[in-house]
Amino acid sequence: MIDCIYNSDSIFEIKKLDSNSIHAIISDIPYGIDYDDWDILHSNTNSALGGTSSAQHKTSLFKRRGKPLNGWSEADKKRPQEYQEWVESWSNEWFRVLKSGSSVFVFAGRQFAHRVVVAFENSGFTFKDMLSWEKDKAPHRAQRISCVFERRGDIANTNKWVGWRVANLRPLFEPILWFQKPYKTGSTLADNLIKHEVGAWNENSLTHWNIQQGALNHSNILKVRITSEDKGYHVAQKPLNLMKLLIDLVTKEEQIVLDPFAGSGTTLLAAKELNRHFIGYEKNNGIYNIAVNRLGIEKNNCFYNKEKK
């Protein structure tokens, strides 16, 4: 049923969707970077990624984060491959349900974005582009290594390493991976547009939703701010207008947008407000209820018979 969000795991439930029935998939998938419990896709965990500090202990985000058992050591070398295998466990189904020429936008962590690309290419997709969503601010902690030596009483190394830090730079951009399901050999893009009405992009969406785009800019760098109305729904919340930009970029009214990792329903709400149909999945009960309330839909109208595997 369209215009619904289902309280279930899309990895299994998406198999119930018809082949070649979806016009676009837009999803903020788990990044596999230990952001929260739902983002830890390996068994090798401990506490805060990149070491801990008193500042981190005061911040709820860093209290939640998992850490590879040995930090960023050789013990973590299997994690990228494990993440790629997890993506490949569902990307084939994404390919199946999409119409030829349809677009997929996937928000991916910088650390493992390349593994998402490989997984999707292995599933048949064409990697079209990598967009950049630029943010005004982002949570960030990079521990001063001199402080570590100072706590050890190692004055020589404290002085030697003043100004040096561990962990990453402040993450002020997020990659948005753009994939496309290729049209059939022997056809043309124009023929595919006539048949499936997907495969091109709408330049007006860039100037309408993006605060930095000029009429002829057509840049793959997107600047969409998070507003007060975007906050408080999910720890990894994306701006509603950013999702509207992506939906408006590759779909037309009355077409179907799918979000298999729907979270608090931002993609689905954007689709609804743009007069697109939507289908979403969210297995976390609490977050699912938030999405239902935002969408203003009745749960009973979106009942999915889970016995039909």
Curated annotation (Swiss-Prot):
GO biological process: DNA restriction-modification system; methylation
Residue runs in coiled coils: none
EC numbers: 2.1.1.72
Recorded GO MF terms: DNA binding; N-methyltransferase activity; site-specific DNA-methyltransferase (adenine-specific) activity
The UniProt record lists the keyword Cytoplasm: no
InterPro entries membership: DNA_methylase_N4/N6, RM_Methyltransferase, SAM-dependent_MTases_sf
Reactions performed catalytically: a 2'-deoxyadenosine in DNA + S-adenosyl-L-methionine = an N(6)-methyl-2'-deoxyadenosine in DNA + S-adenosyl-L-homocysteine + H(+)
Entry annotated with the keyword Methyltransferase: yes
Keywords, comma-separated and alphabetical: DNA-binding, Methyltransferase, Restriction system, S-adenosyl-L-methionine, Transferase
SUPFAM superfamilies to which the protein is assigned, alphabetical: S-adenosyl-L-methionine-dependent methyltransferases (SSF53335)
Protein family per UniProt: Belongs to the N(4)/N(6)-methyltransferase family.
Protein name in UniProt: Type II methyltransferase M.HindIII
Organism: Haemophilus influenzae (strain ATCC 51907 / DSM 11121 / KW20 / Rd)
Top-level taxonomy: Bacteria, Pseudomonadati, Pseudomonadota, Gammaproteobacteria, Pasteurellales
